[in-house]
């Protein structure tokens, strides 16, 4: 069978042209492969963790993560309010409770509840990924959950939009018999049984 390849053709035909031999390459040290790119969530979680740890180091005196408690976390969340972009109307404001205020006011900008809730979720995961024990996770404490609930409720009232908890969908029970398309029920009668 004839080959369509030219590989080895010069040798088979007695060609006098020298064949090029692959030369061994000198050993070059290889750099370690680049780690896989982090997902957006993982990158944000790492940034949040580094920011929180830096916040603790900047405290007077500095606080180590192993000594961090819910009071440090609550202080951090309140510190973040200065960078917030959500207008939260105070009780004395004429726009308090209005869904779409008609004008401007001097009410403070704060972190939105959803942003704080997501932040705590990422920090909770990062704490455990960095060696923290789940049962000692300060981000999972009851005080943090109460704070987030209060922020959610107060922001909802200030905006005039009540927070509604989503109802969980009931799963259909596949074991229940349903009426057939022909109007019969899922039960069989003795007349349908083979004898």
Curated annotation (Swiss-Prot):
A motif (Nuclear localization signal) lies at residues 165-169. One of its GO terms (biological process) is mRNA transcription. Residues 184-195 have a biased composition (Low complexity). Residues 21-36 have a biased composition (Pro residues). GO terms for cellular component: nucleus. InterPro entries: ALOG, ALOG_dom. It is found in: Nucleus. GO terms for molecular function: DNA binding. The keyword Ligase does not apply. Residues 162-175 have a biased composition (Basic residues). Residues 40-167 form the ALOG domain. Residues 1-41, 154-195 are annotated as: Disordered. Probable transcription regulator that acts as a developmental regulator by promoting cell growth in response to light. This is Protein LIGHT-DEPENDENT SHORT HYPOCOTYLS 7.
